[in-house]
C-alpha cells in the first residue's frame, strides 16, 4: 500500500469512529485498492439512475488515448500485468479476488470500478494509477501514460488459483466470459445486443461502471453490479457469480430502459465461432478436422420440445428465428470434447465450454434469434444468439429479465429423449459402401447422416421399428436408411435431398425419430444451402 492509500485508509477509519467489527473489516477492505471518496450505493438507486439516464441524450465517454496506448500490439497489451499486490481484496486474504485490465488498443472507453461495503452500502472508486500495473515486459514507457484513464475491464479469481488463472473476464463493450472445469475460455456473452441483424448499423452497448461487493473471508460467490449505456438504451445489472469446481453459474437481474425505439433488442446474447465441423467442410483445408467454439444451438422450448440446430459457416449472412413463449432454456453447445476431433494443441477447441441460458422470470412471447455470418478463419466470431421479445421496444419502455448462465462442458439439463450425436453431409445418390471413382450417380443429390444416441435407444427391444419423420421447405427426400451404431449405442439415419427446382434458397430441414406413436428423440433442425444449377453435377 503506498502513502496515498495509507493516508486515505487512516482517514476512512477515523471517519467510522465507533463502527462495528464488521464495519471496520469492510473499511479496511475498501481501503486496500479503492481511493475515491465515500459514496452511497444500492441496486435500487442504480436502477433509478439508469432509468433517469435513459431520459437524457446519450453522451459518449470514449477517450482519445495517448499514442503509446492506442497503437499497442496485442502482445504489448497482454504483457501489461496487473500487480497482484494491489488486487481489490488483497487484505481480505480470502477465497476471491479481482484484477483490472489496462486501457489500450481498441479498448478506449474508461470503465469506472467501485468497491462496495454490503453492510453499510458505502462505495469508493478505484482510480487508475501506475502502481497498479507492471509495464516491464510490454515495452511501454509508463511516464507517457498520464491522467485517470479508467480501466478496460476486470477479471475474477478464486482460490486456490488467485493471481494465477482467472475464471471470469469482463472486457470490451458489454462482453464477458467464463471457464469451466477445463480452464479454457471460449465463447462470450454480452449484457445486451441491439440491432444485430436490422436495417441499421449494429450497436454495441458499454458497461461503463462496476461495483464489487466486498466478500467475507470465506465467501465463494462474487456479487457485481453494472451500469450499461448506449445511444439506444441504458441498463442496471446485478451479477451473482458462483465459481464452482466444474462450472461457473451466473444469476443475472437485468433492468433495461429504451432511449429510442429499438428495431431488434437482444436479451442474453452470446457470441461464438464456427468455421467447420462434421457437416460443414467448406473452410477446413487444414490438418484440423473441426474448428469451432460451439457446434450447435440447443433449445428447450416453452412447450417442452427439445431442438438441436447444428451451426453453419454460410457463404453469406443468414438469420433464423425460432418463435417461442416462456422458453425453458437455450444455449450454444460444444458437444464434442475429444482431442481427436480437433487435433489442436494451441487453442484447444476440445476444452471449450458450452453456455446455457435458463430464464428465471417469465419472458413471454418472442423468439430465439440465430445470426450466422461467413468467416474465413478462426479468429473472427461469426455466430450470435439472443432472445428477442415479440412486442416492439419503444422509447421510454422499461424491461426486466432474470436469468442464469451456466458455463460448463455441457448444459446442466438435457432431454430424457435421444439426442443428436453428430450431423454429416456429403455426396448422395448411391448405395452406402460405394466409393466414387468407378462411376458416378446419374442424378445429383445431397446426403445427410444424423446420429442419435441416449434416451434409452440402446435398450429398445430387438425388432423395434424406428421411423424417421422428415420435413423440408422445398425439394424432396428419399433413400432412407436406418443403421445401428453400436459404438455410440444409437442409430444413424441417412437420407438424400433431391432438388425439384433450380432454387438456391436455403432448405429448412426438420427431423425426429419415433416408434409407433412414441417420440424417441429431440428434433433435429438444419439449414442447407443448395449449389447453383451448374454446380449440381459429379465429375
From Swiss-Prot:
InterPro entries: Gal_mutarotase_sf_dom (IPR011013), GH-type_carb-bd (IPR014718), Glucan_biosyn_MdoD (IPR023724), Glucan_biosyn_MdoG/MdoD (IPR014438), Glucan_biosyn_MdoG_C (IPR007444), Ig-like_fold (IPR013783), Ig_E-set (IPR014756), TAT_signal (IPR006311). Residues 1-29 form the signal peptide. It comes from the Bacteria. The keyword Transmembrane helix does not apply. The keyword Signal applies. Keywords: Periplasm, Signal. Its main location: periplasm. Predicted to be exported by the Tat system. The position of the signal peptide cleavage has not been experimentally proven. One of its GO terms (molecular function) is carbohydrate binding. Gene3D superfamilies: 2.70.98.10, Immunoglobulins. GO terms for cellular component: outer membrane-bounded periplasmic space. It is found in: Periplasm. GO terms for biological process: beta-glucan biosynthetic process. Pathway: Glycan metabolism; osmoregulated periplasmic glucan (OPG) biosynthesis. Belongs to the OpgD/OpgG family. Probably involved in the control of the structural glucose backbone of osmoregulated periplasmic glucans (OPGs). This is Glucans biosynthesis protein D. It comes from Pseudomonas syringae pv. tomato (strain ATCC BAA-871 / DC3000).
